[in-house]
Amino acid sequence: MGLLLAVSISCSDDDNDDNTPPVPTVDVMIKETTLGKVLTDGSGKTLYFFTKDVAGTSACTGGCLTVWPVFSVASPRLNAGLNAADFSTITRADGQKQATYKGWPLYYYKDDTAAGDVKGENVNGVWFVAKTDYTMMLGNAQLVGNDGKSYKSDYTEGTADTQFLVDSLGRTLYAFINDKKNVNKYTKADFSNDDFWPIYYADIKSLPSTIDKSLFAVIDVFGKKQLTYKGWPLYYFGPDSKTRGMTKGVSVPRPGVWPIVNKESPNAPD
């Protein structure tokens, strides 16, 4: 009788173990996928960035949320290697809380059914897996110049979203129309004008899958490194005040002199 009871208890315990999924001990972790290391929730489901959120607020509303549900864990428990200072929470226009990473709101993709799925990558050219080591990201937004006017991608006045390169924190990068291939024609030797158009440099690590790493190079500018894209030296615009999504530089001193950069940018001239 004792033996039968022991066997019964053992079987019961085994059944519970088989049917009860493990409880995640963290809310966010880094997981290896076919796209490299990406941010996931505690069960391994991939998290995503939306390029239209470049200003730090969510542009995904209505039916978009059915396809891209928000990741709403506030003060998430983090796996080793993640920095709590990189995470925050925003309150969406619909009142819902949404977690952010380095200012980018985080989402799931409805068609990702298994841990490590990355089916949402490059959907419509505006959704990308969330990574900790992006050197650059892409933003989609209305270009608004320092003159307060709205511009299209050809720098004529008008309303239309344009896609452009930003740093990992969503800050816009620019080219200078007078520069040559991998030659900075703007910055003075004493860097006295660097505050207005600061040169940009960062080690190239991860990039969105639509951006070709081979199109970047590093040049020397009076002893400082500067990153180039398609031969164009890259700059910030000082009056953007290091603010996400600002594009004030596109109208200075007139539209087209300091353009944003993207895949459609021509190669810099020799």
Predicted regions and their residues:
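Bacterial Sec-dependent N-terminal signal peptides
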Residues: 2-30
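N-terminal edge beta-strand
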Residues: 22-38, 141-164
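Post-signal-peptide N-terminal segment of Sec-exported extracytoplasmic proteins
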Residues: 28-69
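A cross-kingdom feature marking solvent-exposed beta-strand/loop segments within repeated
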Residues: 32-33, 76-96, 113-115, 158, ...
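Extracellular/periplasmic catalytic domains that process cell-envelope and extracellular macromolecules
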Residues: 39-42, 92, 98-102, 165-168, ...
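Short, structured motif recognition centered on aromatic/hydrophobic residues
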Residues: 39-40, 45-48, 106-107, 165, ...
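Hydrophobic, ordered structural segments
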Residues: 56, 88-139, 233-267
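A low-complexity, Ser/Thr/Gly/Pro-enriched, surface-exposed linker/loop concept
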Residues: 57-88, 125-131, 181-216, 256-268
